């Protein structure tokens, strides 16, 4: 029986996929697994019992990934599960900004007398632009970026993109190897990147200076991507005409030409259901089969569904060749291995090894000696 703790409200549609082998617990210290959305976990103490964390969403900035890896705790996310929800809001933001809708709404709320005449006289100040034929630049061509490209193309836009890791999926867009080459072409730029050391603050004065005069910038990705000081300078100078973001902060509130949304990107019933379901199924695959799929702190290890045999899972450190060393250890214990896979972290060498074995009893597996000292944690998996 596995105990699961939820740190945020998790969709009951997803939780319904937990079988009788799983129970929900209110006690974090008793949890074998944690389901989380946005709660910050960096200051949390993790019990030795905790084996996995599943983030019902894509971003994992709220989870201490390296600390989890060193403790043999696998962290999963749900890439693509909320992609359609974010895509739709990006399109909404693009249309709102292009047609000056936010400013027009604010103005219209203040109308009082002689409304018809006032509207006819004042509407011209909000004249905007159609997106048909305009060029959209997509920075980051993952699941969301690709969906945005497909939808914007269907609306008659020209699509260009930048992503150093892009592999064509038939989207029919032009991908540039250099941002400085792409940005001057774009009427609208939308960001779809993770926040990490390479991307944090990347939208700075150099980035903004490369953009087309009068362009619109959309950020439905991460707030840390944009340098607010440089952004405000670009808006005040007219270099940018509009900034739409899903991440309000104190620097941006009350500013002209900025549309702030309260982090609505994945806030749809459908996205929450999809993310929760995917997160639960990832946890089940890990606990029931030993597979690691869509982890953000360990490489993929996938043996498919468990059959009649048993599996042994190990987290190990300081092994140049985890498969070879674990094979030797299993062989010494007279455990016959049917198949074995391993995924090793480049950053610190911590690896996950999954072995399918032809035995019903692994009790003779000893953890002494040099190899045993390298094992961080282990478990048996069987039906």
Region roles according to the model:
Residues 39-44, 160, 164-252, 267:
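Rossmann-like adenosine-cofactor binding region
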Residues 319-339:
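Short amphipathic alpha-helix segments
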Residues 158, 213-311, 315-317, 328-329, ...:
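Rossmann-like dinucleotide-binding domain for NAD(H)/NADP(H)
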Residues 141-142:
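Glycine-rich Rossmann-fold phosphate-binding loop(s) that bind the pyrophosphate
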Residues 79-135, 294-295:
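Phosphate-binding beta-alpha-beta segment of Rossmann-like dinucleotide-binding domains, i.e.
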Residues 87-106, 152-157, 278-291, 327-331:
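Oxidoreductase and adenylate-handling cofactor-binding alpha/beta cores
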Residues 1-78, 184, 204-209, 340, ...:
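An N-terminal-biased, well-structured beta-alpha scaffold segment characteristic
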Residues 145-146:
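N-terminal Rossmann-fold NAD(P) dinucleotide-binding loop
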């Amino acid at each position: 029986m596995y105990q699961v703790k939820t740190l945020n409200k998790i969709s009951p549609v997803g939780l319904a996929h937990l079988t009788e082998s799983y129970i929900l617990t209110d006690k974090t210290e008793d949890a074998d697994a944690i389901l989380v959305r946005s709660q910050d976990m960096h200051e949390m103490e993790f019990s030795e019992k905790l084996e996995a964390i599943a983030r019902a969403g894509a971003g994992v900035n709220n989870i201490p990934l390296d600390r989890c890896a060193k403790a043999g705790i696998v962290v999963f996310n749900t890439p693509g599960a909320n992609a359609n929800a974010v895509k739709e809001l990006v399109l909404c933001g693009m249309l709102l900004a292009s047609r000056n809708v936010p400013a027009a709404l604010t103005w219209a709320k203040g109308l009082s007398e002689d409304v018809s005449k006032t509207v006819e006289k004042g509407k011209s100040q909000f004249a905007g632009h159609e997106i048909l034929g305009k060029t959209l630049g997509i920075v980051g061509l993952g699941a969301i970026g690709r969906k945005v490209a497909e939808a914007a193309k269907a609306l008659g836009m020209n699509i260009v993109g930048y992503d150093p890791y892009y592999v064509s999926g038939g989207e029919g867009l032009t991908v540039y190897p250099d941002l400085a080459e792409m940005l001057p072409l774009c009427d609208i730029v939308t960001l779809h990147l993770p926040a990490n050391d390479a991307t944090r603050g990347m939208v700075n004065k150099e980035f903004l200076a490369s953009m087309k005069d009068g362009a619109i910038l959309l950020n439905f990705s991460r707030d840390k991507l944009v340098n607010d000081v440089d952004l405000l300078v670009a808006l005040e100078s007219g270099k940018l005409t509009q900034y739409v973001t899903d991440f309000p902060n104190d620097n941006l509130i009350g500013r002209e030409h900025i549309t702030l949304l309260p982090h609505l990107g994945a806030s749809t019933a459908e996205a929450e259901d999809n993310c929760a379901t995917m997160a639960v199924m990832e946890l089940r695959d890990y606990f029931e089969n030993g597979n690691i799929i869509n982890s953000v702190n360990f490489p993929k290890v996938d043996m498919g569904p468990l059959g009649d045999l048993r599996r042994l899972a190990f987290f190990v450190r300081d092994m140049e060749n985890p498969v070879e060393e674990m094979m030797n250890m299993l062989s010494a214990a007279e455990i016959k291995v049917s198949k074995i896979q391993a995924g090793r972290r480049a950053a610190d060498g911590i690896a996950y090894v999954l072995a399918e074995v032809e035995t019903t009893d692994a009790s003779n597996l000893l953890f002494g000696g040099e190899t045993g000292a390298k094992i961080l944690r282990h478990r048996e998996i069987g039906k």
